[in-house]
Design a protein with these regions (language model features):
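Cysteine-centered motifs
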Residues: 12-14
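Extended, histidine- and acidic-residue-enriched regions that form the cofactor-binding/catalytic faces
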Residues: 24-136, 140-156, 162-349
């Protein structure tokens, strides 16, 4: 299995790809139908099977999108990553359509599944706001969906998500590699390659907040300044109480594993009160260029194996290794419980 190091991992970050003006409503409110001579955006669930069969296998891209449900503090909906992954997909489609008007873009409905939650770092494994599945389950879903597309001859599959948990990312990278190698297609985990370059742009944050701003606020990450800003830009679901939230300072990634021992943690880090839609717009515009560049490399057939990949780009950390071992232990216990129950049920048949 891909080497996993859980350092910055639990800073669940959302990669949204966009370059649209602030006054324009999010594209993710609905896929756009184009003329029927190519260059269409097609919702898979709305097509008949003859219509699917007419799609060009080479000049089309299937977008396989995952949006997990996870606590994001008292101010951002638990569907934060879901909404942002949806935005990634639609806004990247806009960018790609401009560059490749001959391609059909096929939109698979967002799958609301993900592994882990930032609350796990606080040892709150059953947090009321997080609905997660096991790593092996997520990997299997991604593989099966990818195979279902690739086995029909469609050559391009872009996997989009918005969650920073390491095993979540590894599941998608392994699934993409399996489908690509087994079926001779290009299934690319776009988001984890973007994360390999970094999350939110320090340059953008410094521009808006001033250099050294995080000396007071700490690293921005899960439901903090950056992520709250991104949500403010994308939709109107952020609770106005974000303006009154006190900073929860984590000085560096090593401090992530101490949050469960500190009083007052409400499911976020950094300082949500400093967020703004304007910051979110600029962070997103930075991310769109990186995501689009990776997508272009994939479409041109470039070897992506030399690109930095999350979480393989993280440094080693004993606390992370211990946490990862505990996570696999919990999953093994759950799987053993399920296996025992199924065996008992089958004995009675």
């Amino acid at each position: 299995m891909t080497s996993v190091r859980l350092t910055l991992a639990l800073v669940c970050v959302c990669t949204i790809v966009a370059c649209m003006p602030a006054e324009e409503p999010p594209v993710s409110q609905g896929a756009e139908q184009a003329p029927m001579n190519g260059g269409r955006v097609l919702k898979l669930e709305e097509l008949t099977y003859p219509e699917i069969d007419e799609i060009d296998r080479d000049q089309s891209i299937f977008f396989l999108t995952f949006g997990n449900l996870e606590e994001h503090g008292p101010h951002i909906p638990v569907g934060s990553d879901y909404y942002q992954a949806n935005g990634v997909r639609d806004l990247l489609i806009k960018r790609l359509r401009a560059a490749h008007p001959e391609y059909d873009m096929v939109v698979v409905p967002v799958i609301p599944l993900g592994e882990g939650g930032f609350n796990d770092a606080a040892h709150q494994f059953d947090h009321v706001g997080t609905f997660a599945i096991r790593y092996s389950t997520l990997q299997a879903v991604a593989i099966d969906m990818g195979v279902s597309i690739a086995s029909k001859g469609f050559q391009n599959i872009f996997l989009i998500h918005s969650h920073g948990a390491p095993l979540h990312n590894v599941a998608f990278t392994e699934a993409s590699a399996f489908v690509s190698e087994t079926y001779g297609v290009r299934m690319v985990n776009i988001t984890s390659l973007v994360f390999g370059e970094g999350f939110y742009s320090d340059a953008v944050l410094d521009k808006h907040l001033g250099e050294g701003w995080n000396q007071e606020s700490g690293i921005t990450g899960h439901a903090g300044t950056g992520e709250t800003s991104a949500n403010l830009f994308l939709h109107d679901l952020v609770n106005p109480n974000y303006r009154e939230l006190e900073p929860f300072v984590v000085e560096d990634s090593f401090g992530i594993f101490d949050i469960g021992d500190r009083n007052g943690w409400q499911g976020y880090i950094s300082d949500p009160s400093r967020a703004s839609a304007l910051i979110g717009r600029d962070l997103i515009n930075d991310l769109v260029e990186r995501s689009f560049r990776i997508a272009e490399l994939a479409l041109s057939g470039e070897d992506l194996s030399s690109l930095p990949l999350y979480p393989d780009n993280l440094p080693p950390m004993p606390e992370a290794d211990a946490y990862l071992a505990a996570t696999f232990g919990r999953y093994a216990s759950r799987e053993a419980e399920i296996t025992a129950w199924l065996e008992k049920q089958r004995e009675g048949r």
